[in-house]
């Protein structure tokens, strides 16, 4: 499967970036799709939650728990390609800027410009910077209190949030794929993500949730000296 997919990427990946954003084929298409949703929304408010490092199979685990904790939650799912190399600093900045990586060479190796890029994107769509909110480093604590410290309900139109709990679990994992699924399940059962989504919906936001990249089990080379 990996061999076939690699061959497909060589032939087709370069053509994905210029496809229309109606059904986002790549992560930098996502904000432009949000613009369309905002225009069609009764409240004119959108919220984007980026779960750092969440793989597709782990999303299945997350989805099942979200639906169990909130039986009224309605979801639509689609698949989107990350940017290669699938690094946080590359793909996540593409998400928040709405642009391919070639447009942010000076910050390609870090994520400190995400908030600025997110604000610039929405200013380009006619919003004031006061209508835009961004916060990263989420995943623990009281989701409602955290959200209320970031946004002004009824005023903030575009919300960008980074949940990095799964990425932290991944970088500390020593028990492989099974350990990842188990810890992600335990974290989800704590209810942070469910509360975050529910409160955004209660405030009238259309909520999108995506990952910037996934993760895969591999054999390392030990701890370098």
Language-model segment annotations:
Residues 1-225:
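Feature captures the catalytic ectodomains and active-site-proximal regions of enzymes
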């Amino acid at each position: 499967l990996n061999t076939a997919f690699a061959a497909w990427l060589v032939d087709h990946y370069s053509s994905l970036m210029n496809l229309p954003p109606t059904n986002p084929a790549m992560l930098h298409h996502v904000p432009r799709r949000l613009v369309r949703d905002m225009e069609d929304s009764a409240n004119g408010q959108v919220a984007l939650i980026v779960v750092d490092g969440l793989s597709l199979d782990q999303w299945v685990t997350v989805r099942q728990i979200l639906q169990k904790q909130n039986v009224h939650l309605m979801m639509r799912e689609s698949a989107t390609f990350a940017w290669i190399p699938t690094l946080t600093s590359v793909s996540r900045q593409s998400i928040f800027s709405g642009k391919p990586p070639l447009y942010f060479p000076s910050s390609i190796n870090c994520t400190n410009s995400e908030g600025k890029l997110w604000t610039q994107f929405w200013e380009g769509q006619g919003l004031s910077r006061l209508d835009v909110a961004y916060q990263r480093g989420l995943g623990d604590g009281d989701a409602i209190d955290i959200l209320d410290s970031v946004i002004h309900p009824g005023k903030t139109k575009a919300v960008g949030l980074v949940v990095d709990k799964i990425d932290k679990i991944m970088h500390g994992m020593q028990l492989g794929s099974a350990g990842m699924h188990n810890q992600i399940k335990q974290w989800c059962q704590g209810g942070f993500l469910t509360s975050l989504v529910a409160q955004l919906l209660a405030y009238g936001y259309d909520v999108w949730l995506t990952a910037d990249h996934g993760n895969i089990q591999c054999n390392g080379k030990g701890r370098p000296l």
